[in-house]
Amino acid sequence: MHRTTRIKITELNPHLMCVLCGGYFIDATTIIECLHSFCKTCIVRYLETSKYCPICDVQVHKTRPLLNIRSDKTLQDIVYKLVPGLFKNEMKRRRDFYAAHPSADAANGSNEDRGEVADEDKRIITDDEIISLSIEFFDQNRLDRKVNKDKEKPKEEVNDKRYLRCPAAMTVMHLRKFLRSKMDIPNTFQIDVMYEEEPLKDYYTLMDIAYIYTWRRNGPLPLKYRVRPTCKRMKISHQRDGLTNAGELESDSGSDKANSPAGGIPSTSSCLPSPSTPVQSPHPQFPHISSTMNGTSSSPSGNHQSSFANRPRKSSVNGSSATSSG
């Protein structure tokens, strides 16, 4: 499979930033007439003096433009997950604001409005965050025995697990290299890191896995690994080479049969050429060894010296061609 294209956050900035303040969306709000989004405070302040969209100049509403704007929670979650540290910094600003202005009306707001929501509650993971994970050997037979397992088997399963604390930006490829070096697995075997029964791609980070499989932080991120041999392709290539060598040996034996005393007898084998088809020499670097005579192929045999001795030689005397025999 082809690797998934990964783009930079700067390429997505036009879709994540407010044109009114130039920053990333905070409390993203969308105009329902044209679907352009802005920060909530930015668009509310703008619509106090205008009734048109700041981007496309479409009329939001004739008299009450605030009726045609909606909070976009999905877009805001995307911004928080794509921009590292944005959610944590925003929550800190809100806590500092209400601490400096205790008279501000925050009782009617939600915990997020007051800045009292942690990253864990929002399920937002940053690149520098440390993720706890557990990894164990994937055994298909163990899964089949789950129905009839006895009291000692759960202890074995617990002992097989290993617990790690890794940064969220760590990739599956790094985890595979760690397992190979830690367990001395030779290079002739391939390691697959899995979530449940699905192999994970090498470029997945732990943060990607947590988002894709909706990790709830109610325990370590459960991962598994399996080891399998990687020499299958080499076996296929060896078989192909063996077939090729066998074909060459068979063609050589066919040419030898043509020069043998029984070579003049017609053969029913499909490996031999037809009388009208010239046979190429099995030694391309010496094309003069094989020649086509009367539709049959002759190749060097045990008496090839006598054939060269009886072969006529051409010589040129005063521009005329004369043929002499040895």
From Swiss-Prot:
Record key words, sorted: Chromatin regulator, Cytoplasm, Metal-binding, Nucleus, Proto-oncogene, Repressor, Transcription, Transcription regulation, Ubl conjugation, Zinc, Zinc-finger
Transmembrane segments: none
Induction line: Down-regulated by oxidative stress.
Pfam family of the protein (one): RAWUL
Annotated localization: Nucleus; Cytoplasm
Interaction with PHC2: annotated segments: 162-182
PTM annotation, UniProt: May be polyubiquitinated; which does not lead to proteasomal degradation. Monoubiquitinated.
Sample GO molecular function, one term: promoter-specific chromatin binding
Residue stretches in coiled coil: none
GO cellular component, one term: PRC1 complex
Biased composition (Low complexity): 266-278, 290-303, 315-326
Region (Interaction with E4F1): 164-228
Gene3D superfamilies: Phosphatidylinositol 3-kinase Catalytic Subunit, Chain A, domain 1, Zinc/RING finger domain, C3HC4 (zinc finger)
Top-level taxon in the UniProt lineage: Eukaryota
Renumbered residue ranges of the record's region Disordered: 236-326
GO terms classed as biological process: chromatin remodeling; negative regulation of gene expression, epigenetic; negative regulation of transcription by RNA polymerase II; positive regulation of ubiquitin-protein transferase activity
Motif Nuclear localization signal: where in chain: 81-95
PANTHER family noted in UniProt: POLYCOMB COMPLEX PROTEIN BMI-1, RING FINGER DOMAIN-CONTAINING, POLYCOMB GROUP COMPONENT
Function of the protein: Component of a Polycomb group (PcG) multiprotein PRC1-like complex, a complex class required to maintain the transcriptionally repressive state of many genes, including Hox genes, throughout development. PcG PRC1 complex acts via chromatin remodeling and modification of histones; it mediates monoubiquitination of histone H2A 'Lys-119', rendering chromatin heritably changed in its expressibility. The complex composed of RNF2, UB2D3 and BMI1 binds nucleosomes, and has activity only with nucleosomal histone H2A.
Protein name as annotated: Polycomb complex protein BMI-1
Species assigned in the record: Felis catus
